[in-house]
């Protein structure tokens, strides 16, 4: 098949995954163009702008592969659509996942729109996921590398957003991606994977957050209201957290099991098997699916409530088009603001953002 007339615009980040994605597409004969997205104006603790370093690596790879490349600045879109959302969620005492919103609003909206204006037939990224095309549209499938599968972060995408997408490394193991990069002497072959939230990088999370949200010290209390210590800000803590509480004493360890925004209290309970840490029902909003056909009344599935969590059997019941009730086996530390992501075997059905968490009919203090 002659792919030379098919234009694929690849998001090249300066990392090994997108580098190999671009290489594979070039080898398959596509007309490949690389685009580097600058989403955040950042400097690390040593005064080095990591985006500049990434751009240099992206340019080096584009030249090695022999593809044209451009740089596009999405800082304003990112700030307005992702970072503002991130801060708003923390203000509400929730724990958001900005990577999901970045994919939904930037990589597969702003970038996708830009690529299509360039005349792209497809866009591609270095995500570990797969696309299956059939008579009933396009389906989003888990990446074959179970440890690297990134469908959790792609779960808010719609059919419209994924129908012209390719994930060239989704069929590969991470080890194979590194081997390909080394075989072809790509500049990013030995570059370590980026970790953490893109706009924070390797920096201290609490310190970063304090620049944008005023931290307010308050009491750490047990479930009976007894004061156990002090916290430096509710936003620095998440459900199920054990470390950094500064509570000693005898007996089992203490865990965060709730937040009271009205009184600025962090609520803790004792013991890692404490029932207050476990839930079996949640309510979620902003439901999205990439499937063309889905039972909008209810369906059985498996679910993940955080990245790399094992699949849990679940039942999803629609309240309306965007709100769902999800029931599941007892699960620890299910957290408002995170995504509940739904699967049917290898197929990622979609996701919704967790609002309220229950154990039976009892609403947990989160």
Swiss-Prot record:
Its EC number is 2.8.1.13. GO terms for molecular function: ATP binding; tRNA binding; tRNA-uridine 2-sulfurtransferase activity. Gene3D superfamilies: Adenine nucleotide alpha hydrolases-like domains (2.30.30.280), HUPs (3.40.50.620), Translation factors (2.40.30.10). It holds the Pfam family tRNA_Me_trans_C. The record marks 127, 338 as: Interaction with tRNA. Disulfide bonds join 102-198. Keywords: ATP-binding, Cytoplasm, Disulfide bond, Nucleotide-binding, RNA-binding, Transferase, tRNA processing, tRNA-binding. Its main location: cytoplasm. NCBIfam families: PRK00143.1, trmU. HAMAP family: tRNA_thiouridyl_MnmA (MF_00144). This is tRNA-specific 2-thiouridylase MnmA. It comes from Finegoldia magna (strain ATCC 29328 / DSM 20472 / WAL 2508) (Peptostreptococcus magnus). The lineage of its organism: Bacteria, Bacillati, Bacillota, Tissierellia, Tissierellales.
């Amino acid at each position: 098949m002659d792919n030379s007339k098919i234009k694929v615009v690849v998001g090249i980040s300066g990392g090994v995954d997108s580098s190999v994605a671009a290489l594979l597409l070039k080898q398959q004969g596509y007309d490949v163009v690389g685009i580097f997205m600058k989403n955040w104006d950042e400097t690390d603790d040593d005064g080095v702008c990591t985006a500049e370093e990434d751009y240099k690596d992206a340019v080096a790879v584009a030249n090695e592969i022999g593809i044209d490349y451009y740089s596009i600045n999405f800082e304003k879109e990112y700030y307005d659509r992702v970072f503002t959302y991130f801060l708003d969620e923390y203000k509400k005492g929730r724990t958001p996942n900005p990577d999901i919103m970045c994919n939904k609003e930037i990589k597969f909206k702003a970038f996708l729109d830009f690529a299509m204006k360039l005349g792209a037939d497809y866009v591609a990224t270095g995500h570990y996921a797969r696309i299956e095309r059939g008579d009933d549209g396009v389906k989003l499938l888990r990446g074959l590398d179970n440890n690297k599968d990134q469908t959790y972060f792609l779960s808010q995408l719609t059919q419209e957003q994924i129908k012209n997408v390719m994930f060239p490394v989704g069929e590969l193991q991470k080890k194979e991606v590194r081997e390909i990069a080394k075989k072809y002497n790509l500049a990013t072959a030995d570059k370590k994977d980026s970790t953490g939230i893109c706009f924070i990088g390797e920096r201290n999370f609490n310190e970063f957050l304090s620049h944008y949200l005023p931290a307010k010290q308050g009491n750490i209390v047990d479930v009976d209201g007894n004061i156990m210590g002090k916290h430096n800000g509710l936003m620095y803590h998440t459900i199920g957290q054990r470390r950094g509480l500064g509570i000693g004493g005898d007996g089992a360890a203490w865990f965060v099991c709730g937040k009271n925004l009205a009184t600025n209290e962090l609520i803790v309970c004792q013991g890692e098997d404490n029932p207050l840490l476990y839930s079996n029902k949640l309510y979620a909003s902003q439901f999205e699916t990439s499937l063309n056909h889905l039972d909008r009344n209810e369906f059985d599935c498996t679910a993940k409530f955080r990245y790399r969590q094992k699949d849990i059997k679940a039942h999803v019941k629609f309240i309306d088009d965007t709100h769902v009730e999800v029931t599941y086996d007892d699960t620890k530390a299910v957290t408002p603001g995170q995504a509940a992501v739904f699967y049917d075997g290898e197929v990622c059905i979609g996701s919704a953002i967790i609002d309220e968490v229950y154990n039976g009919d009892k609403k947990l203090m989160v």
